A protein has these predicted regions:
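Conserved catalytic/acceptor-binding region of the Class I
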Residues: 131-193, 205-209
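A short acidic, Gly/Pro-enriched loop at the edge of an enzyme's catalytic core
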Residues: 94-103
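Class I SAM-dependent methyltransferase SAM/SAH-binding core
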Residues: 41-43, 49-95
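Residues lining the SAM
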Residues: 105-110, 135
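A short glycine-rich, Lys/Arg-flanked "PGG" loop and its adjoining helix->strand segment in the class I
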Residues: 116-128
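Core SAM-dependent methyltransferase catalytic element
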Residues: 232-240
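Conserved alpha-helix/loop element of class I SAM-dependent methyltransferases that forms part
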Residues: 21-41, 55
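C-terminal helical/coil "lid" or tail adjacent to the Rossmann-like core of SAM-dependent
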Residues: 3-5, 11-12, 23, 177-228
């Protein structure tokens, strides 16, 4: 089972809460733009503590939304957060056993080896007329040197797991029997202090980064009047 590079500690859960709040708007817009159709059975891959699962319930209404994650601790929190959904411990790098009208992932491929193969496996679980929906970062733009240092460090951490941090290009290839309905770059501005808050919580899972953590914490407290701009690739395929 693929190990998540950033762990499932209390700080990791705090970071995921910040990520959920920070990127809620672009994700909600993407889900609203998914072409209409039968959307009764929905899978949320790498659901963590259930933030994206709640968005899927909001977007597709009553039905059967199932969150899948490798961490039982994360899923315990997800069950409390989204009692209307179902949750299953499973490895998203293996074939999915639940067919669905919608298969969704956000910022997950960057943690997986061979992301293109993962897309093919996920598409195999999509029912005809259903949608495979993915969001992956392409890059972020900032003039802050500390953010450049963070990016270099996290790129190495993810690469050590056999994965690629900026997984947006993995969405270039079309899974078999799928055609693109959406393919766009969403730009999303985030306050520099909020970006620093997410980043230092990540950095605590690595050894040997105390100076980087301290500088990011100082930046969170200072909360300067500037932004970091994420470029997020949003793609939706419809299964033939």
């Amino acid at each position: 089972m693929t190990r998540y590079a950033f762990g499932d500690t209390d700080l990791a859960r705090e970071r995921l809460g910040l990520v959920a709040e920070t990127f809620r708007e672009p994700t909600a817009r993407l889900l609203a733009d998914v072409p209409p159709g039968v959307r009764r059975y929905v899978l949320d891959l790498g659901c963590g503590p259930g933030y994206t699962t709640a968005l899927l319930l909001d977007a597709f209404g009553p039905g059967y939304v199932t969150g899948i994650d490798s961490s039982s601790a994360m899923l315990a929190e997800a069950r409390m957060r989204v009692p209307a959904a179902f949750f299953v411990v499973a490895d998203v790098t293996t074939p999915l056993k639940l067919p669905a009208h919608v298969v969704f992932s956000r910022m997950l491929l960057g943690h997986l080896p061979e992301p293109e193969r993962a897309l093919v496996r996920w598409a195999n679980a999509v029912l005809p007329g259903g949608a495979l929906v993915c969001e992956e970062p392409v890059r972020y733009r900032s003039t802050r040197k500390v953010f450049e240092r963070y990016e270099a460090t996290v790129t190495e951490v993810v690469a050590a797991q056999g994965a690629t941090l900026w997984a947006g290009p993995a969405l270039d290839s079309d899974p078999p029997r799928c055609h693109r309905a959406i393919d766009r770059i969403a730009e999303h501005a985030v306050a520099a202090g909020r970006a620093a808050a997410m980043f230092w919580r990540n950095a605590t899972t690595w050894r040997g980064a105390p100076d980087l953590i301290a500088e990011l914490q100082d930046l969170e407290r200072a909360n300067p009047d500037e932004t970091v701009v994420w470029e997020i690739r949003q793609t939706c395929w419809i299964k033939r």
